[in-house]
Structure formats: C-alpha cells, structure tokens
Amino acid sequence: MYSPEPLKGTLQTILLKVLKDHGKMYGYEITQRVKELSEGRIHLTEGSLYPMLHRLEAEGMLKTETVLMGKRVRKYYALTAEGRSLVKERLNELFDFIKTISTVLQVKIT
C-alpha cells in the first residue's frame, strides 16, 4: 500500500477516470474498484473519498442519484458533461507531470 502523500495529488484524477470507465457508482463501490484496479496498493479512506466526491459535485463535475436499497439509502455518483471533459484534462496533466518527474529524477518509467 502506498503512503497517502502521493495519492493526494492524484485522487481527483483517479475518481474521475473510474467514474468515466464504470458509469454511476456509490462510494464503497468506488473504493473497491480502485483497490481492485491497483491490485490492493491503493486504499481509499472515507476521509479522503467523500470530501473529494462532495467537492466535485459542488463544482458541477458530478451528479448524484439517491436510491433506497431495502432500509438503506445509497448515493450514486456519475460524471456530468463538464466532468467528462475534465477527465481528459486531468489525465493529460498527470501524464505530463509523470514525464517531467521522471526526467528530473533521471529514471525511466516502464
């Protein structure tokens, strides 16, 4: 598992990309998908996940749908059109940043 520091700068991009690829999802489902995709190396906590989801919703990047599942309420998150365009922008920024960091550190990314 990675330390939380590198994750802080990439959390938004991770969430946007997962939602782009998988459509509407609820919070726990997002955490499990990220854990699966990262082969267990990234564990999202509620303390990092939900504030970011709420921020993205407030900025108009996400829309929500509340569904009653038995006696529980489940809140689903999905990208808006603006959120879908932000995914591309954030991915390009991240790839450029990784390239720059690898140059600065003089390491080759494989």
Model-inferred region functions:
Residues 4-5, 61, 110:
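Short, contiguous hydrophobic alpha-helices characteristic of membrane insertion segments
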Residues 1-7, 90:
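Intrinsically disordered, low-complexity serine/threonine- and proline-rich regulatory segments
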Residues 72-91:
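Basic, amphipathic "hinge/linker" alpha-helix immediately C-terminal to the N-terminal HTH DNA-binding motif
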Residues 49-56:
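Basic amphipathic alpha-helical segments that dock to polyanions
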Residues 57-73, 78:
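Beta-hairpin "wing" of winged helix-turn-helix
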